[in-house]
């Protein structure tokens, strides 16, 4: 496994692989790797001849200085894990390499609409930071495939839209969320939880499943469902951040035409922000029967 901290050297090695006719799959990360990240790496291995992983804690996408400063950094352990997965190339740039003139003078990429709704409304600039760094990394690595976790649902939607809008010749591949045995979605931030917080953390996933069951059971009073879910989180001493129930394709309010919904949730445990999501079908057997009767 080769590790690069500079752009030019990484580019040259990738060009050599491509001259040899090899395909490249890319997994961008912020480090503190867990089994969820390694699942992305395994998927990348299935897709291409060469796997490139980046480890970069991107300051542009953080809206709170304390969150940036507290983000776990475990480079040595990360490199050991990637070696075990047989990764060919790892890119570990510094902020000075990625933003040589500083953030204030950095050209940015921003996907209109979707970047400013839902999570983007409460975290201004977050998705701009994501779009900018992913565009730069795509430009550096020039992958055939790029793998992202579906846990960051809106982020994945932003990246897919950006890739389409900019006509990038890259296949963006979403990979299902990997969970702990108790249902908690794996996240680098989980390592910041205290023992007590870690015991309470699965409440987020349980509440999400409750929302899903309520909707499948026929509840379409979504505002009321969200209120009930908020109460459940508070009862477990989680601080609700955001809960959205929206159309899976548009991320807008559910309409009579919606066939699938996505539940997007976030909550704080102490200083740690946890996120999760679940996609569910809205077309019930009753609705299907009505459609069949109408067709007759």
From Swiss-Prot:
It catalyses: (R)-pantoate + beta-alanine + ATP = (R)-pantothenate + AMP + diphosphate + H(+). Pathway: Cofactor biosynthesis; (R)-pantothenate biosynthesis; (R)-pantothenate from (R)-pantoate and beta-alanine: step 1/1. It is an enzyme of class 6 (ligase). Keywords: ATP-binding, Cytoplasm, Ligase, Nucleotide-binding, Pantothenate biosynthesis. It comes from the Bacteria. The keyword Membrane does not apply. ATP binds at residues 30-37, 149-152, 178, 186-189. Its EC number is 6.3.2.1. Beta-alanine binds at residue 61. GO terms for biological process: pantothenate biosynthetic process. Pfam families: Pantoate_ligase. Belongs to the pantothenate synthetase family. This is Pantothenate synthetase.
